[in-house]
């Protein structure tokens, strides 16, 4: 038996409570001695029986579906193995931590996040349909068809990644769960979209009844997001043929079209833009009520027998464009706000966007998609009950402002992000009084959870408390607008400009400065990020990092930084290649590693390390700049998970950052390797003319940038170590800095550095 399987021997199957007590007492042990058994009352639940102070206590482990488990109201875990691992570290409601287990048998592999590699997994990996067919004749193997491998994959996930339709069909016939999630939170549908297996996708939905609206717990993507990001146009077509919503939103607020645009899949963008919008199947006369409050809605639904799925929609008297869906489920009424942006995009909570209210109703009549049940029985108003209901509404009948056939676009051609409406128990009057002016305010992004229950410090949170913290910290170094004068523009970007200026310090000294400003149309969106960047920089003090002198609150808001005279390293590399020696490149590499080591110690991740963001003070000194994407990581965590969308520099990003939005010092190390490559190619674009999507595919197939002509073998080996697929096997910045400080290969750098001190 393998070491991995030995760790899973805590399961005792269908033993009774009394037998569990006898087994634990007979085996003996200290506090925290435990076993897991089946729950007699609930077939999908389990029971934790454990010893504490010579007594045996029992705790029901509730199965919440989707291989998720929890004890009472405690944390939710994917897999029993993750639940046990957690309670071995912290008691968190149990009388003590779990310690040793009473040896039983192998736990059910379908109830784990990380199981064992079975013969079925291996046969699927080898694409051997005959072996798979033979194995599925075994009743035990068939019963465990949803078992997870040591990598957290079901057999169906493996075959879907291969696009092996014959094996997929056999697995579905054997009862494979077409909506199960793997260790990365992806369903088989998301896997086939990732690998662009359109025929397999059709098979999963048509034969396996796969849930193609299921969201990834990591980023909130549905399969259409995955297909759009990968440029899998045929998969996009299949999903839309099954009436998938065109505009679901991720946790970042991105629609599939947004991702297609970000990853330069312009054929997918064009397809979305030209896809015909179907006429809605329902009419507002079937379910819309005017001048109706919550109590009135309840009375109408009670008179309509309160059948599950009965519903109506009522408009707000005070706030035009807002609606409330009142839905009956198990004799209770549920109220969901329906918001819209400029009477155009309608949505419930973090659900998809719809071009009209009837389109929203159509969707939820077909898919519950977060609601407690389908919309089934529309209840018309008294006025409309007296007239025949039209089978299909026309635009004139809608009596609602008709939106354009495609998403609203902002100046960048991107669909505008929409807010996350809170579910509330307030009265309708309170809701809409509070929201009356919200349409004029900047719309918030969707929240997403902090990883591993580790709270990111307030200073980097997006919420109101975090905003106030940022403002308070920034105001410690306020610079009056009257004390600065503006000079020439040094550079311009998507969100703002950098302007050379002079600051008259409180001591009366004139100091040359660089001032970062926002474009007028980016004021609302960018001010919070400016404050965030100011907060990050205010906590840093290092010779290899650009210093923040203060913040001018304006208007406009300005970040006032030290002026780094020679500008971006990228420009210098391209413009002055003949003047740059190998020792210069090595010196700069050592200084960048030194500055990043400092960030590593301060528990910051930069997230945008690139030659364009390294500035030259002089030929002998570089400084790391541009902390607009930088984030702190919480105590007890080594990584940060992105909460915001936007355009990411994919060419500089590690695979885990591209795929899962996970950033750490180790993802910064990957970017450091790309920056080294830029330096030794004198400013070449990483991956040349590849699109963002092609870069992702190149990396997944173990592709790496080639050695630059002017790069020593030893330095290229450092780059390759930075690009290891396993983040834990990449060097730390401390190790990188040590290499430049102690390795004989870089003796010339140390001599040069000592000479210029």
From Swiss-Prot:
ATP binds at residues 490-498, 516. This is Tyrosine-protein kinase HTK16. The lineage of its organism: Eukaryota, Metazoa, Cnidaria, Hydrozoa, Hydroidolina. It is an enzyme of class 2 (transferase). Belongs to the protein kinase superfamily. Tyr protein kinase family. It catalyses: L-tyrosyl-[protein] + ATP = O-phospho-L-tyrosyl-[protein] + ADP + H(+). The gene is HTK16. May be involved in signal transduction. Residues 381-407, 444-467 are annotated as: Disordered. The modification Phosphotyrosine is found at residue 746. It comes from the Eukaryota. It comes from Hydra vulgaris. Its EC number is 2.7.10.2. Gene3D superfamilies: Ankyrin repeat-containing domain, Phosphorylase Kinase, domain 1, SH2 domain, Transferase(Phosphotransferase) domain 1. InterPro entries: Ankyrin_rpt, Ankyrin_rpt-contain_sf, Kinase-like_dom_sf, Non-receptor_tyrosine_kinases, Prot_kinase_dom, Protein_kinase_ATP_BS, Ser-Thr/Tyr_kinase_cat_dom, SH2. Keywords: ANK repeat, ATP-binding, Kinase, Nucleotide-binding, Phosphoprotein, Repeat, SH2 domain, Transferase, Tyrosine-protein kinase. Residues 484-740 form the Protein kinase domain. It holds the Pfam family PK_Tyr_Ser-Thr. Epithelial cells. The active site is at 608 (proton acceptor). ANK repeats lie at residues 115-147, 151-180, 184-214, 219-248, 252-281. One of its GO terms (molecular function) is ATP binding.
């Amino acid at each position: 038996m393998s070491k991995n399987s030995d760790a899973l021997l805590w399961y005792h199957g269908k033993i009774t409570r009394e037998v569990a007590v006898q087994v634990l007492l007979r085996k003996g042990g200290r506090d925290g001695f435990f076993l897991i058994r089946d729950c007699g009352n609930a077939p999908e639940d389990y029971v934790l029986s454990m010893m504490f102070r010579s007594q045996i206590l029992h705790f029901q482990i509730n199965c919440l579906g989707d291989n998720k488990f929890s004890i009472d109201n405690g944390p939710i875990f994917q897999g029993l193995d993750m639940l046990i691992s957690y309670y071995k570290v912290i008691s968190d409601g149990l009388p003590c931590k779990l310690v040793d287990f009473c040896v039983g048998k192998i736990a059910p592999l379908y109830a784990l996040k990380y199981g064992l590699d079975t013969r079925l997994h291996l046969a699927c990996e080898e694409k051997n349909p005959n072996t798979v067919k033979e194995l599925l004749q075994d009743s035990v193997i068939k019963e465990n068809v949803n078992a997870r491998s040591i990598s957290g994959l079901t057999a169906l996930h493996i075959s879907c990644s291969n696009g092996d339709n014959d094996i997929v069909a056999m697995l579905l016939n054997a009862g494979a769960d077409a909506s199960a999630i793997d260790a990365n939170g992806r369903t088989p549908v998301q896997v086939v979209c990732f690998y662009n297996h359109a025929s397999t996708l059709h098979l999963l939905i048509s034969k396996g009844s796969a849930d193609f609206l299921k969201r990834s717990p990591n980023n909130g993507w549905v399969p259409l997001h995955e297909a759009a990001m990968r440029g899998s146009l045929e998969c996009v077509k299949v999903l839309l043929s099954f009436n998938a919503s065109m505009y679901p939103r991720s946790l970042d607020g991105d629609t599939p079209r947004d991702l297609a645009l970000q990853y330069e899949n312009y054929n997918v963008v064009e397809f979305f833009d030209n896809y015909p919008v179907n006429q809605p199947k329902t009419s507002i006369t079937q379910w819309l009520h005017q001048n109706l409050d919550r109590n009135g809605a309840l009375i109408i639904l009670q008179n309509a027998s309160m059948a599950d799925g009965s519903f109506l929609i009522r408009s707000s008297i005070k706030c035009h464009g807002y609606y409330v869906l009142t839905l009956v489920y198990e004799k209770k009424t549920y109220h969901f706000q329906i918001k819209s942006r400029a009477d155009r995009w309608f949505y419930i909570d973090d659900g998809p966007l719809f071009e009209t209210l009837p389109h929203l109703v159509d969707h939820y009549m077909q898919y519950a998609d977060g609601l407690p049940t389908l919309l089934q029985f529309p209840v018309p108003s008294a006025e409309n009950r007296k007239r025949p209901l039209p089978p299909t509404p026309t635009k004139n009948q809608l009596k609602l402002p008709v939106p354009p056939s495609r998403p609203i676009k902002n100046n960048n051609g991107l669909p505008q992000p929409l807010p996350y409406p809170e579910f509330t128990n307030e009265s309708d009057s309170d809701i809409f009084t509070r929201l009356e002016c919200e349409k004029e305010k900047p719309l918030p992004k969707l929240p997403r959870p902090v990883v591993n229950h580790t709270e990111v410090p307030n200073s980097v949170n997006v919420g109101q408390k975090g905003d106030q913290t940022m403002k308070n910290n920034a105001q410690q170094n306020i610079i009056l607008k009257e004390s600065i004068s503006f000079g020439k523009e040094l550079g311009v970007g998507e969100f703002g400009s950098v302007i050379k200026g002079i600051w008259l310090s409180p001591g009366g000294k004139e100091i040359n400065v660089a001032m970062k400003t926002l474009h007028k149309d980016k004021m609302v969106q960018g001010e919070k990020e400016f404050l965030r960047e100011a907060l990050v920089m205010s906590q840093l003090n290092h010779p290899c990092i650009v210093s923040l002198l203060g913040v001018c609150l304006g208007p406009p808001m300005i970040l006032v930084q030290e002026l780094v005279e020679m500008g971006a390293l990228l420009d210098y590399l391209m413009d002055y290649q003949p003047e740059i020696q190998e020792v210069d490149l090595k010196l700069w590499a050592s200084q960048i590693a030194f500055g990043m080591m400092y960030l590593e110690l301060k528990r910051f991740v930069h997230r945008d390390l690139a030659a364009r963001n390294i500035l030259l003070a002089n030929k002998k000194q570089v400084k790391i700049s541009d902390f607009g994407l930088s984030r702190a990581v919480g105590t007890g965590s080594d990584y940060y998970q992105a909460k915001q969308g936007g355009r990411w520099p994919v060419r500089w990003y590690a695979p885990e950052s591209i795929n899962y939005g996970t950033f750490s010092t180790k993802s910064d190390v990957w970017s450091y390797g790309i920056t080294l490559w830029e330096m030794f190619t004198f400013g070449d674009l990483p991956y040349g003319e590849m699109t963002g999507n092609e870069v992702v595919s190149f990396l997944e197939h173990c592709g790496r940038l080639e050695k630059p002509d002017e790069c020593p073998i030893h330095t290229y080996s450092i780059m390759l170590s930075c690009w290891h697929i396993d983040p834990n096997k990449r060097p730390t910045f401390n190790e990188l800095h040590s290499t430049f400080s102690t390795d004989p290969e870089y003796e010339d750098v140390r001599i040069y550095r000592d000479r210029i001190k």
